[in-house]
């Protein structure tokens, strides 16, 4: 289960700053759903390569002490309900306010783990600034400087410890501010595997059912499509126990291949499909994407592609998931409208040109069966193992066709490539000065590998590693003849000085 962390507090206490730091973005627009989840932003975050979580920025809770409860009901109650843990942010420079007291009073009423976080304590006496906040009746408080990353890692370790058994919480003294700025600039280590680990991962993925997440905006036909798929296969539908925000996992089999349908809309009785109003939970959808192998994004052909569609697509890409696009409600459209829809898809979805697009009618079943051809193709592309010799040969062909650029008078040299992981496929390239490669050449290599390996339906990632020079720290050792020549030269130099 991917934990969900909600950031709650009044305006200007640093929620967006912390959100941007956790998601490693600059504009806090990681997964923004305007209109549907007003004033709440959703993003992927990682404490390290093994511990992922979803973070929600609730926006500011504004108003007086009397009005705070109303504002919270409008924009933050839903986020608090979705969250596994709440980080209640206050401003250490501004001190305690009536709005802070009202928020704290509400959090005490609900049975939800909450942590008081005093932000903006850099450059001031932190203990003195925090003194007033003990009036809120909390057992502990955590001091951070979100703008500089101080204390953020220790805070996250403490907040996420109940959800990860192997996560060691900080043993630092309460109130102590640690210099943990490595969270600010650190890059997440790429998912790298040895050859043996890559082979083991490939075998594991081939033996498991394909987990397919069906996602999309409300009322695009996700539930209709889910029931159409299940109805065609005549499987027994059951739902696994979970909370109200958990997706339903439905096992099924098609053409001898096992699948698990991750239904974010919930399973409906077949006779009541049209009576059901589709509910949309952002957290449920994002969790489904994280847990899936292949993501099936359903788009409404009768509406323009929205920012919500692009946000969901971007989230799936960032998670490295294989993608298949289903344009639903295609039946009944005249040819002119269909052509306009296709042009709009080409214009706005050019960044996922590797994904197959299907035009379907979930209600009547048109084109639904062909979806599984693309789903299997995408999964195979994401998990098929490619040997080091093949990857190195493709890399050599790419550099022969278009050499790497010169940097400070020296040409960047790529030596060899090997598989670094799957789902999504990762290619690791070793060479000299590879960190100096421009983004344009990296994109060229990515497209070259995709075309050569015929990878469809999945993103591909390339990691670059500088090859170590084995003689870098070793002093030159002269041969016997070179040593004699050196002595003669030194003797000549000394005689000239005399």
From Swiss-Prot:
GO terms under biological process: ribosome biogenesis
Record-annotated EngA-type G domain positions: 3-167, 210-383
Chain segments annotated as transmembrane: none
SMART domains named in the record: AAA (SM00382)
CDD domains membership: EngA1, EngA2
Similarity comment: Belongs to the TRAFAC class TrmE-Era-EngA-EngB-Septin-like GTPase superfamily. EngA (Der) GTPase family.
HAMAP family in the record: GTPase_Der (MF_00195)
PANTHER family in UniProt: GTPASE DER
Assembly and oligomerization: Associates with the 50S ribosomal subunit.
Role noted for this protein: GTPase that plays an essential role in the late steps of ribosome biogenesis.
Protein's UniProt name: GTPase Der
Organism: Vibrio parahaemolyticus serotype O3:K6 (strain RIMD 2210633)
């Amino acid at each position: 289960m991917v934990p969900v962390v909600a950031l709650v507090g009044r305006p200007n206490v640093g929620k967006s700053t912390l959100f941007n730091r956790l998601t490693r973005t600059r504009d806090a627009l990681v997964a923004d759903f305007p209109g549907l989840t007003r004033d709440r932003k959703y993003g992927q975050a990682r404490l390290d390569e093994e511990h992922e979580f979803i973070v929600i920025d609730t926006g500011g809770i504004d108003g007086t002490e009397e009005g705070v409860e109303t504002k919270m009901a409008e924009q933050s109650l839903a986020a608090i309900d979705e969250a596994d843990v709440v980080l209640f942010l206050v401003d250490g420079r501004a001190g305690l306010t009536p709005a802070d007291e009202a928020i704290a009073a509400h959090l005490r009423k609900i049975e939800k783990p909450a942590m008081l976080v005093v932000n903006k304590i850099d450059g001031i006496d932190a203990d003195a600034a925090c003194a007033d906040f003990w009036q809120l009746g909390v057992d502990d408080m955590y001091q951070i400087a979100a703008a500089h990353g101080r204390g953020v890692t220790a805070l996250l370790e403490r907040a996420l410890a109940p959800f990860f058994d192997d996560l060691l919480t900080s043993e630092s003294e309460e109130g102590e501010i640690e210099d943990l700025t490595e969270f600010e600039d650190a890059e997440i280590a790429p998912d790298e595997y040895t050859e043996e680990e890559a082979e083991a991962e490939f075998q594991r993925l081939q033996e498991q059912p394909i987990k397919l997440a069906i996602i999309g905006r409300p009322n695009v036909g996700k539930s209709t499509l889910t029931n159409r798929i299940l109805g065609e296969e005549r499987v027994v539908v059951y739902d696994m126990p979970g909370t109200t925000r958990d997706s339903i996992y439905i096992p099924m089999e098609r053409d001898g291949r096992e699948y698990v349908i991750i239904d974010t809309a919930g399973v409906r009785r077949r006779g009541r499909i049209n009576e059901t109003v589709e509910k949309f939970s952002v957290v449920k959808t994002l969790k489904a994407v994280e847990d899936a192998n292949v993501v099936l994004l359903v788009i409404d052909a009768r509406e323009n592609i929205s920012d919500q569609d692009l946000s969901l697509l971007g989230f799936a890409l960032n998670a490295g998931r294989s993608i298949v696009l289903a344009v639903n409600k295609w039946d009944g459209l005249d040819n002119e409208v269909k052509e306009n829809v296709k042009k709009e898809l080409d214009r706005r979805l050019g960044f996922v040109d590797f994904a197959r697009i299907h035009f379907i009618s979930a209600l009547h079943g048109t084109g639904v069966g062909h979806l599984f051809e693309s789903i299997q193709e995408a999964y195979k592309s994401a998990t098929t193992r490619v040997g080091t010799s093949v990857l190195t040969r493709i890399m050599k062909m790419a550099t022969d066709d278009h050499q790497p650029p010169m940097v400070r008078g020296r040409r960047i040299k790529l030596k060899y490539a090997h598989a670094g992981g799957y789902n999504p496929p990762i290619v690791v390239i070793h060479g000299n000065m590879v960190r100096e490669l421009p983004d344009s050449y990296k994109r060229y290599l990515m497209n070259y590998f995709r075309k050569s390996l015929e990878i469809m339906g999945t993103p591909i990632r390339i990691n670059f590693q500088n090859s170590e020079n084995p003689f870098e720290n070793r002093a030159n050792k002269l041969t016997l003849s070179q040593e004699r020549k050196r002595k003669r030269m030194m003797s000549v130099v000394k005689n000239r000085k005399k």
